[in-house]
C-alpha cells in the first residue's frame, strides 16, 4: 500500500547543490473512536501549553542570519541579563559556559510519552464520568498541537474547528531568554518572532476544563512546566492578531492577545 504524507525537511543555507537529505516518517494506527482532533474540540475547552527546551528544530535560517549579520561567535557567552540557562535534563547542564552555540544546539524536547499518558488517562476519566456513550466527548483530552515551523498560532489553528477560535494570552508564560537575546541581536520584532519560533511553547493540549489539573500534574511528573494559556470560544474572536487557514488547513482561528513576558 502507499502511505501518503510524511515530512519534507528544508535546509536553506545548509545543503549544497549536490547534497541531499534523507528523511523518515512513521504512520500510526488508532481505533477510530479514540481518534483525537478538531472534531472533538468545543467551546469552553481550555488550552494548556507545555514548555519547550529551546529553539527545538525550527527557525534556524533566521538564527544563522542573525548571528552572521551581527558577527557574533557561536562560542560567545550570552549576557547574564537574559537569564539563559540549560533547561532541566539538558546534556549541556554541566558545561562551564552555556554559550550561544550550546543554547542553539539544545535538543528538541519529546512529548510523545506525556501525550500518550494523557490520552489514556483522559479516556479513563471520561468513562468514569459516564461520558462513554458514543459522544464526541469520549475523552477528556480533545486535541494536541505540536508547535513546529510557523510558530504557536499557525500550528494551533490546525486543530481548531471551523466556527470556533482559541484565544491565547501571551502573558501566561515566560518566554525563555534565548529568544529575547536573538530578537535583540537581530532586531526581530514580536510578530516575526511569533511566526517563526515556538517562544517557549513546544506542545499544546486542548482539554475539557475538568481535566486541567490532571493534565498539569502529569506534566509536572514528567518534569515539564505547563500553563493554562487560553480558551476555545465561539462568536467573534478578540485579540490584536487573528491567524487561520495555515498549512493548508481550513479550520478555526487563533486569536493572540496581550504581551509576552520576557
Predicted regions and their residues:
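Phosphate-handling active-site elements
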Residues: 34-37, 73-75, 166-169, 215
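Short, surface-exposed linear patches
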Residues: 25-27, 45-48, 69-72, 165-168, ...
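N-terminal hydrophobic or amphipathic segments with adjacent small-residue motifs
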Residues: 7, 22, 31, 38, ...
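Glycine-rich anion-binding loops of enzyme active sites
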Residues: 1-61, 231-233
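Glycine-/charge-enriched secondary-structure boundary and capping motifs
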Residues: 15-20, 84-103, 109-262
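Acidic, glycine-rich loop-and-beta core segments that form the ion-binding/anion-interacting portion
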Residues: 41-104
Amino acid at each position: 500500500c502507499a502511505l501518503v504524507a510524511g515530512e519534507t525537511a528544508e535546509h536553506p543555507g545548509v545543503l549544497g547543490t549536490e547534497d541531499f537529505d534523507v528523511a523518515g516518517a512513521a504512520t500510526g494506527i488508532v481505533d477510530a473512536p479514540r481518534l483525537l482532533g478538531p472534531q472533538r474540540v468545543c467551546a469552553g475547552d481550555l488550552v494548556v501549553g507545555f514548555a519547550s527546551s529551546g529553539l527545538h528544530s525550527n527557525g534556524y535560517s533566521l538564527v544563522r542570519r542573525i548571528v552572521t549579520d551581527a558577527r557574533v561567535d557561536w562560542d560567545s557567552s550570552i549576557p547574564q541579563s537574559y537569564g539563559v540557562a540549560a533547561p532541566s535534563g539538558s546534556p549541556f547542564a554541566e558545561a562551564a559556559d552555556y554559550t550561544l552555540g550550546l543554547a542553539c544546539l539544545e535538543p528538541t524536547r519529546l512529548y510523545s510519552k506525556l501525550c500518550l499518558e494523557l490520552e489514556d488517562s483522559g479516556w479513563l476519566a471520561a468513562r468514569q464520568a459516564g461520558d462513554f456513550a458514543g459522544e464526541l466527548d469520549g475523552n477528556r483530552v480533545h486535541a494536541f498541537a505540536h508547535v513546529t515551523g510557523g510558530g504557536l498560532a499557525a500550528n494551533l489553528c490546525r486543530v481548531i474547528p471551523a466556527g470556533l477560535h482559541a484565544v491565547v494570552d501571551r502573558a501566561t508564560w515566560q518566554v525563555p531568554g534565548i529568544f529575547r537575546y536573538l530578537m535583540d541581536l537581530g532586531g526581530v520584532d514580536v510578530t516575526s518572532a511569533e511566526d517563526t519560533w515556538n517562544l517557549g511553547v513546544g506542545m499544546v493540549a486542548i482539554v475539557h476544563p475538568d481535566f486541567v489539573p490532571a493534565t498539569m500534574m502529569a506534566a509536572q511528573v514528567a518534569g515539564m512546566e505547563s500553563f493554562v494559556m487560553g480558551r476555545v470560544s465561539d462568536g467573534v474572536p478578540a485579540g490584536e492578531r487573528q491567524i487561520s487557514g495555515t498549512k493548508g488547513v481550513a479550520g478555526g482561528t487563533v486569536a493572540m492577545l496581550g504581551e509576552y513576558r520576557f
